[in-house]
Amino acid sequence: MAHAEAIGELRALLGDRVSTNDTVREHHSHDESFHLPVMPDAVVFAESTDDVVTVVRVCNAHRVPLVPFGAGTSLEANSNPIHGGISLDMSRMDKVLRISGEDLDVTVQPGVRRKQLNEVLAGHGMFFPVDPGADATIGGMASTGASGTTTVKYGAMKQLVMALQV
């Protein structure tokens, strides 16, 4: 019952950014791992930090599980909603907000994909070195401490992320 109440409250607050469509839910039920899919009760498409705060507050108030979803490229079932609940899709938060060539840093939203970021940075003579193999989102890479083929030379996410807004 709590899940239905939470979904109803989220729909009232976020409108059509809340989906219970079976196809959408199925897409968010798995990643690239071998684990069996588990359907979330609903998927919420966040478009701003305020949306994320709203979803977290509603899920917390109703004690409904909440699992963030980036690109679904994890090999460890990190985004799989093993207890159902809400899958919080970050793909619409995909903007590069600031680039500082002088400081060699960049501010991005969590849904920015690795290849997208490198395309933007190339125009500034910069690149993002973490390469886990998949075209993961920066949020997903930060949440898992991603590394890859360039880690020995440049470091993993934990060496390269200066700050996070949570």
Q: How would you label these PLM feature ranges?
A:
Residues 85, 137, 161-163:
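Broad gene-expression machinery/nucleic-acid interaction feature
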